[in-house]
Amino acid sequence: MGIRTFRPYTPGTRQASVSDFSEITKTQPEKSLTTYKHSSQGRNNRGVVTSRHRGGGHKRLYRIIDFRRDKHNIPAKVAAIEYDPNRNARIALLYYQDGEKRYILAPADLKVGSTVISGEDAPFEIGNALPLWRIPLGSEVHNIELVAGRGGQMVRAAGASAQVVAKEGNYVTLRLPSKEVRMVRKECYATIGKVGNADVRNLKLGKAGRSRHRGKRPHVRGSVMNPVDHPHGGGEGRAPIGRPGPVTPWGKPALGAKTRNRKKASSKLIIRRRNQS
């Protein structure tokens, strides 16, 4: 992926940058692998806002992604690398030898014409999916299962990868992108390599309109509201919030308050939390 910048013809183009989409080889999605995606606009079934700052945005077709990689021991050819509006990563269209078509997350350096395969006996190559116990120490992996057969749930964002650091008993230890170190059952599958399109973090929107196209509405600070609207509101000019610490619009502690359930069963599998130095 390359980054394209603009001359400052307008204030919006002065700072803006976009992907050059040089890695995209097919512009229209595979029709059989798409479905309609209803946008909830941040509302629940009663029409009440449950997630603020959402609404508008361009309509999207959802691409059905194969996170399970459960088509074992059947080779597939990479037919195209495509854009997906629902995620930062690119997706790869696979043609299996038996005629089935599927989308997967496109790893970095995966080329059109390459062959990928999943299974216990799959070779150690980019894009192949193997059980964690078959992957060598020090390897980069992504799309990692937490429960065998459920499908990849971790490390799916553009440019992300986890590292296999140890194997002991029925568990494999991984270092995640957040620096958290945790154990995962050895029979869980993961895909070799890191997710592509890593330069997406270097893009700049340049103007508010591009954020609105993505379905994001303005995020207004509580300190500039009235007291009726937010606990931080009110006062003369730029007044302090008048509390020991910041809170949400509903008065609960925010910005650093722990939200993880202390009794969560998976806590015993986490060796080092992400927020520990």
From Swiss-Prot:
A Gene Ontology biological process term: translation
Cross-referenced Gene3D superfamilies: 2.30.30.30, Nucleic acid-binding proteins, Ribosomal protein L2, domain 3
Annotated GO CC locations: large ribosomal subunit
Similarity comment: Belongs to the universal ribosomal protein uL2 family.
Protein name: Large ribosomal subunit protein uL2
Region (Disordered): 1-20, 27-55, 207-277
Amino acid composition bias (Polar residues), ranges on this chain: 27-48
Name of encoding gene: rplB
PROSITE patterns, alphabetized: RIBOSOMAL_L2
Keywords, alphabetical: Ribonucleoprotein, Ribosomal protein, RNA-binding, rRNA-binding
Lineage of the organism: Bacteria, Bacillati, Cyanobacteriota, Cyanophyceae, Oscillatoriophycideae
Extent of Basic residues compositional bias: 207-220, 259-277
Domain of life, per lineage: Bacteria
Gene Ontology molecular-function annotations: rRNA binding; structural constituent of ribosome; transferase activity
The UniProt record lists the keyword Ribonucleoprotein: yes
Quaternary assembly: Part of the 50S ribosomal subunit. Forms a bridge to the 30S subunit in the 70S ribosome.
InterPro entries in the cross-refs: NA-bd_OB-fold (IPR012340), Rib_uL2_dom2 (IPR014722), Ribosomal_uL2 (IPR002171), Ribosomal_uL2_bac/org-type (IPR005880), Ribosomal_uL2_C (IPR022669), Ribosomal_uL2_CS (IPR022671), Ribosomal_uL2_dom3 (IPR014726), Ribosomal_uL2_RNA-bd_dom (IPR022666)
Protein role: One of the primary rRNA binding proteins. Required for association of the 30S and 50S subunits to form the 70S ribosome, for tRNA binding and peptide bond formation. It has been suggested to have peptidyltransferase activity; this is somewhat controversial. Makes several contacts with the 16S rRNA in the 70S ribosome.
